[in-house]
């Protein structure tokens, strides 16, 4: 039986999953992420009609990292015909780590999907070709989607990622060798790392992504963000490829389209109802939030929600 939502449900869920804190590992590949306190835990919901619910550290901002890959795809969809995007990046899950080069080499420089690093870099390469100021444009889009004017990039995180960018640079140069990367590699990498370094809270993320629960429309915006078809396509990609190589396990446990980031955030969508954002910085071996997945599993079981 599906239950109605209230803050007490979210508080109870956080109490249930809090014992998991200490069992995961905060991302440490760059110092700026490694310094985050691992005990943080938050959850927020925004419904399609504008109701908000939250518990824990739901208002504390953190580095959204790969969650931004959904946002860059949204911007690309608004500036490119569908066929131009999907001839350069695929729609299939990779089954490989998010920063793998092996599969990319075997498949002639065409990334499996836009939510692995290679695919997101292709999307950023496309934005560089269509936008005069890609970083500023992304800020404008995110601020509009969220309705919050002071969202910005964490310059320390972006700089730290650029200083440790050898593997992502290798991915970009490999794609360039296959003719699937057209612009200056360092410039596109800087844009990509700034997108990953967006700082947002669970509440801001839930509000930002609620359009995906409502066929591309958000209750607080006059114009659709994307078309209903594009919203379905993005949700489908999130369901198959949004949780790195553990998308199948996540579908089994949670049953919602979702996108994670190594900052410990996860955004999940209940179509026609709500967007959910959780944050717990400690990660499982696949790079997904350990307590965050458990919280989403508890929530879908409690509310009786699943797309399957």
Curated annotation (Swiss-Prot):
Show the GO MF annotations. Answer: glutaminase activity
UniProt entry keywords in alphabetical sequence: Hydrolase
Query: InterPro entries, from UniProt?
Result: Beta-lactam/transpept-like (IPR012338), Glutaminase (IPR015868)
Which residues bind substrate per the record? Answer: 66, 117, 161, 168, 192, 244, 262
UniProt keyword Hydrolase present: yes
One Gene Ontology term from the biological process aspect of the record: glutamine catabolic process
Instruction: Give the reactions, separated by semicolons, that this protein catalyses.
Output: L-glutamine + H2O = L-glutamate + NH4(+)
Catalytic activity, EC: 3.5.1.2
The record's note on quaternary structure and interaction partners says: Homotetramer.
Q: What does the sequence similarity comment in the record state about its family? A: Belongs to the glutaminase family.
Protein name (Swiss-Prot/TrEMBL): Glutaminase
What is the originating organism of this protein? Salmonella typhimurium (strain LT2 / SGSC1412 / ATCC 700720)
């Amino acid at each position: 039986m599906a239950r109605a939502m209230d803050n007490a449900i979210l508080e109870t869920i956080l109490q249930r999953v809090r014992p998991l804190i200490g069992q995961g590992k905060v991302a440490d590949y760059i110092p700026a992420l490694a310094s985050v306190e691992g005990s943080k835990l938050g959850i927020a919901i925004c419904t399609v009609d504008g109701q908000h619910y939250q518990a824990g550290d739901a208002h504390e901002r953190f580095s959204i990292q790969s969650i931004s890959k959904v946002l860059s795809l949204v911007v690309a969809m608004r500036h490119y015909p569908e066929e131009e995007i999907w001839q350069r990046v695929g729609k299939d899950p990779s089954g490989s780590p998010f920063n793998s080069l092996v599969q990319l080499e075997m498949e002639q420089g065409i990334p499996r999907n836009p939510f692995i690093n290679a695919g997101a870099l292709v999307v950023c390469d496309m934005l560089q070709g269509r936008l005069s100021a890609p970083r500023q444009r992304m800020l404008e889009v995110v601020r509009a989607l969220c309705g919050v004017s002071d969202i910005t990039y964490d310059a320390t995180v972006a700089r730290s990622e650029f200083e440790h960018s050898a593997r992502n640079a290798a991915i970009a140069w490999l794609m360039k060798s296959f003719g699937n990367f057209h612009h200056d590699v360092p410039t596109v990498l800087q844009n990509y790392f700034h997108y990953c370094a967006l700082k947002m809270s669970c509440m801001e993320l839930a509000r930002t992504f609620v359009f995906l629960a409502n066929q591309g429309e958000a209750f607080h915006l006059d114009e659709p963000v994307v078309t209903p078809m594009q919203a379905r396509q993005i949700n489908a990609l999130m369901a198959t490829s949004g949780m790195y190589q553990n998308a199948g396990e996540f579908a089994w446990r949670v049953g919602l389209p979702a996108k994670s980031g190594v900052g410990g955030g996860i955004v999940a969508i209940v179509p026609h109802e709500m967007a959910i954002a959780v944050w717990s910085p400690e990660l499982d071996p696949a790079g997904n939030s350990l307590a965050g997945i458990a919280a989403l599993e508890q929530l879908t079981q409690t509310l009786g929600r699943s797309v399957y």
